[in-house]
From Swiss-Prot:
Protein name: Sodium-dependent acetylcholine transporter
Membrane topology (UniProt): Multi-pass membrane protein
GO molecular function: acetylcholine transmembrane transporter activity; amino acid:sodium symporter activity; L-amino acid transmembrane transporter activity; neurotransmitter:sodium symporter activity; PDZ domain binding
Keyword Glycoprotein attached: yes
Transmembrane regions listed in the UniProt entry: 75-95, 100-120, 152-172, 258-278, 287-307, 336-356, 368-388, 422-442, 476-496, 502-522, 548-568, 584-604
Chain's role: Mediates sodium-dependent uptake of acetylcholine at neuromuscular junctions during periods of increased synaptic activity, may also prevent spillover to adjacent synaptic sites. Not involved in the uptake of other neurotransmitters (GABA, glycine, proline and glutamate) and there was also no inhibition of uptake by adding an excess of other candidate substrates (GABA, glycine, taurine, creatine, proline, alanine, carnitine, glutamate and betaine).
Family: Belongs to the sodium:neurotransmitter symporter (SNF) (TC 2.A.22) family.
Disordered: annotated span: 1-21
Subunit structure, interactors included: Interacts with stn-1; part of the DGC.
Keyword Nuclease: no
Entry-linked PANTHER family: SODIUM-DEPENDENT NUTRIENT AMINO ACID TRANSPORTER 1-RELATED, SODIUM/CHLORIDE DEPENDENT TRANSPORTER
């Protein structure tokens, strides 16, 4: 039917005559009623002014903001994912499990456990321009996952802040002619402080044997004494960490005193985070140039220096010599799966947040592979750095590599690597560089963890809080300063161990499984991949592989990781100290708290949904009407009739359009299978090479709808 009039005055307020039937193919399949009660445009709403010309200059989304450029965005993702785990966990696993052979299960699990979740969170965050809570408009019943992620991000914020404070404490004390932990002549050294075997034997004017013993000749009696030096006491870096930095108490129930110097470091780190986030992604996007690029430069300098030390090359060759028999050990595969899952910081909400500030049509496929490759490279370079230090330490203590044992976590960074750097010439310089690198790496991660919390809160309540973002940031930082104070007590290390072993481990895997089921089974894997196509313009390569991976392999992998974590769990201890039962029970309760929010919020969403019981289930299992691109110009690329201004352009009053499904969405029977229908549409889209509901394709085939151009303005 031809269009005889385009006069907007002849139409009603929503651009359509009453009584007309509308082709529902121009609506998203989850819109449940004709007009969807779309609100008019406001500056604090979720939809930007429609059809605004996009030139690539300035913010695309002027309400929420965007990254200033692509490099800001990429460095932010790299800074968030390539964290301190590349220096204190991955090298330990490689050393314990067959050297380079461990890379085989690690890379396999990286593709099966990390890549799918990384892809999914980046796509949904960029597609909806929403942070961790608001993104769950996609499946309102599972909105509690967003609250759980924000809660876990709060734990991460405190955790990384304490690590930053410890690092800052070390950094400040590195600015001296002789770093404190290089010798035992200190008040905190204690009785069992032991220097390196070669140094100690040299001080006694002895001769070092191959087995690590020292022969000392006594001039007065012409006798010799053999001393097994490497069996003595503790190295000074461990004494320094326990007695000076932490003022460590006897146990978790012995709170001790507050370390005021450490408390000031905590305050300084939180002030730094506040200043970096004060202007949102505009300021944090500039900080990452220092927080991400400088650590790479320092890492190169440190690696070059350590490779020149005695014994370092032997350890590197030890690393490069694979022990293939470990591939038959299921425990090694379990460790690789756990490390691969945590290596890209999935399921804490940070990836949703970072991706939400990128431009809508940013090519996310290339970004995902680039970030994963950089993450692997950083982990490998971290391994080389650690193995070089191991070789040098074994040389100093006259211990063979096969008999050398290290601990992961805090000990690897603050004890072992600190001890290795203390033996290098010009030690204060290299120790200072090392702790600057660790401080910047941890700060970059903490910065975006806090940004996740702030953005999630502001996105969930935009009318009240988006204009007052700085007030939200101030409140969040002040709250976390108070929560960080208990970790500055003498028992702080024990609580950090509990936090590491319980709160920041298995709850993330539970969230990953629920998130995977909600997106790939409830929302539909086809719809998620269609969102990716909407962003980039083409389907991800190997579409069938991705579909099988998301829908079937990922849930099984996450369940396997969860079972491994629970079955492999042993009674937690720190050195010889056994944690009491009540502290472990407390840690379990804290770890379970974020997960309890998921059913609570789900029940709340069901209760506030309107309609009968069946209609309530319909509303909480299907995407909210507001789900989709944040800007109207992007929504209008496929569903122009969802935008009031577009309806005034596209629908003259006399046009008679029939529903494509024969019934309106509000009259749709509750037995209608949304996922099946949309999946069929998606498969049709793939076969034709374009979206079935793309406005340009509709305009070309339907004479009743005028051609819509992206640059059209009202």
């Amino acid at each position: 039917m031809s269009v005889s009039s385009n006069d907007p005055e002849q139409r009603n307020g929503r651009g359509m005559a009453s009584g007309n039937n509308v082709d529902m193919s121009l609506y998203p399949p989850f819109i449940k009623q004709l007009d969807a009660k779309l609100p008019d445009y406001t500056r604090e709403g979720d939809i930007e002014y429609p059809f605004e010309e996009i030139t690539g200059v300035g913010d695309e989304n002027r309400i929420r903001g965007n990254w200033s450029n692509k490099s800001d965005y990429l460095l932010a993702v790299i800074g968030f994912t390539a964290g301190v785990g590349s220096f204190w966990k991955f090298p330990f696993l490689v050393f314990q499990h067959g050297g380079a052979a461990f890379l085989v299960p690690y890379l396999c699990m990286l593709c099966l456990a990390s890549l799918p979740m990384f892809f999914m969170e980046m796509v949904l965050g960029q597609f909806s321009s929403s942070a961790a809570i608001s993104v769950w408009k996609v499946v309102p019943l599972f909105k509690g996952i967003g609250f759980a992620q924000v809660t876990i991000s709060g734990f991460f914020a405190v955790f990384f802040n304490i690590i930053s404070a410890w690092t800052l404490f070390y950094l400040i004390n590195s600015f001296s002619f002789s770093i404190p932990w290089s010798n035992c002549a200190n008040s905190w050294s204690g009785e069992n402080c032991t220097l390196g075997t070669r140094i100690q034997c040299k001080e006694m004017n002895g001769t070092l044997l191959v087995n690590g013993s020292c022969i000392v000749e006594h001039a007065s009696s012409n006798e010799t004494t053999v001393i097994p030096l490497h069996d003595l006491g503790s190295i000074p870096s461990l004494k320094y960490f326990h007695n000076d930095v932490l003022m460590l108490s006897k146990g978790v129930d012995d709170f001790g005193t507050l370390n005021w110097y450490l408390g000031l470091c905590v305050l300084a780190c939180w002030i730094a985070v506040f200043l970096c986030l004060f202007q949102g992604v505009k300021s944090s996007g500039k900080v990452v140039y220092v927080a991400v690029i400088v650590p790479f430069i320092i890492l190169t300098v440190l690696l070059t220096r350590l490779l020149t030390l005695d014994g370092s090359l032997a350890a590197v060759f030890y690393f490069l010599t694979p022990k293939w028999e470990i591939l038959m050990d299921l425990h090694v595969w379990g460790e690789a799966a756990v490390q691969a899952f945590y290596s890209v910081s999935c399921c804490s909400g940070g990836l949703f947040t970072i991706a939400s500030y990128s431009r809508f049509h940013n090519n996310i496929y290339k970004d995902i592979w680039l970030v994963l490759i950089v993450d692997v490279i950083v982990s490998l370079v971290g391994c080389l750095l650690t193995f070089s230090a191991i070789g040098f330490t074994c040389y100093e203590f006259a211990i063979s590599l096969d008999k050398f044992h290290i601990r992961d976590g805090f000990h690897l960074v603050f004890v072992f690597l600190a001890e290795a750097l203390a033996g290098v010439s010009v030690a204060p310089l290299y120790a200072g560089l090392f702790f600057i690198m660790i401080l910047l790496v941890v700060h970059a991660t903490q910065m975006f963890v806090v940004e996740t919390i702030v953005s999630s809160i502001c996105d969930e309540y935009p009318e009240r809080l988006r204009r007052n973002r700085r007030h939200v940031l101030t409140t969040v930082c002040a709250l976390f300063i108070l929560l960080s104070i208990p970790f500055c007590l003498s028992s702080g290390l024990f609580w950090m161990e509990l936090l590491t072993q319980f709160v920041l481990t298995w709850p993330l895997v539970v969230i990953a499984f629920l998130e995977c089921m909600a997106i790939n089974w409830v929302y539909g894997v086809d719809n998620m991949l269609d969102n990716a196509k909407w962003i980039v313009g083409y389907w991800p390569p190997c579409y069938i592989f991705w579909k099988i991976l998301f829908k079937f392999i990922c849930p099984m992998v996450y369940l396997a990781i969860l079972c491994f974590l629970w079955l492999d769990w042993n009674s937690i201890q720190y050195e010889s100290y056994q944690f009491p039962y009540w502290s472990i029970l407390t840690a379990w309760c804290i770890a379970s708290f974020p997960l309890i929010l998921i059913p609570i919020v789900g029940i709340w969403q069901f209760c506030i949904a309107k309609g009968t019981i069946t209609q309530k289930w319909w509303r909480v299992l299907y995407p909210d009407d507001a789900w989709g691109p944040a800007m109207a110009i992007h929504r209008a690329e496929k569903f122009p009739l969802q935008i009031p201004e577009a309806r005034r352009l596209l629908l003259p009053p006399e046009v008679e359009i029939a529903s494509s499904r024969g019934v309106l969405q509000e009259e749709m029977p509750m037995s209608y299978d949304y996922n099946t229908s949309s999946a069929a549409d998606v498969r049709s889209n793939r076969s034709t090479g374009h979206g079935a509901t793309d406005v340009r394709s509709v305009a070309a085939t339907n004479n009743t709808i005028p051609k819509f151009e992206r640059e059209t303005a009202i």
